[in-house]
């Protein structure tokens, strides 16, 4: 596990509340729309990569999804998510892992990531991610990144920007682009 990145994210989640970080969404509308656009049932296996303290899991539970996994490099982020969910947290599989070191024990019908991929700035990291996704994402993969017009940093870390075309080309060998959407991150 990349100790520098892990320490960074542990500090963020130890010192910041959800309203103090730019990525917090009260309602993860776009993610929910994407997930609902796929022909799946409520027993579909869904993994939220970098989901930490995201409320996506809350909405998925409320909508009856039964097989949800949340993966994050930050144990503190996952603790916050568990605390927010209370007793419902036991319905979720929680995994503390750097995505580039993740060793999935199952496959997923939906691989959702609006928080991690853009932080992979080196080709080796991207290749590791692709190898893991190739094995574990057997249904649909939905990725959110910063566009070429977006920020060059997030939470003080460098990110990699993508156009719809460049992001599609990264995944083209293993995944077909079904749709793309632009959304402004303010």
Q: Which residue ranges define each predicted feature?
A:
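A conserved beta-strand element that flanks and buttresses the S-adenosyl-L-methionine
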Residues: 112
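Short catalytic micro-motifs in class I SAM-dependent methyltransferases
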Residues: 115-119
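Class I (Rossmann-like) S-adenosyl-L-methionine-dependent methyltransferase catalytic domain
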Residues: 1-106, 120-186
């Amino acid at each position: 596990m990349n100790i520098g990145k892990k320490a960074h994210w542990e500090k963020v989640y130890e010192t910041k509340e959800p309203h103090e970080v730019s990525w917090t969404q009260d309602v993860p509308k776009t993610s929910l729309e994407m997930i609902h656009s796929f022909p799946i049932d409520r027993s579909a296996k869904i993994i939220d990569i970098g989901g930490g303290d995201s409320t996506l899991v809350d909405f998925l539970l409320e909508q009856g999804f039964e097989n949800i996994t949340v993966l994050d490099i930050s144990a503190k982020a996952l603790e916050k998510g568990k605390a927010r969910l209370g007793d419902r947290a036991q319905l979720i599989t929680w995994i503390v892992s750097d995505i580039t070191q993740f060793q999935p024990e199952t496959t997923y019908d939906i691989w959702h990531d609006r928080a991690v991929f853009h932080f992979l700035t080196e080709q080796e990291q991207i290749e590791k991610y692709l190898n893991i996704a190739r094995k574990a994402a057997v249904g649909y993969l939905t990725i959110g990144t910063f566009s070429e017009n977006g920020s060059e940093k997030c939470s003080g870390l460098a990110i990699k920007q993508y156009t719809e075309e460049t992001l599609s080309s990264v995944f083209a060998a293993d995944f077909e682009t079904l749709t793309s959407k632009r959304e402004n991150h303010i």
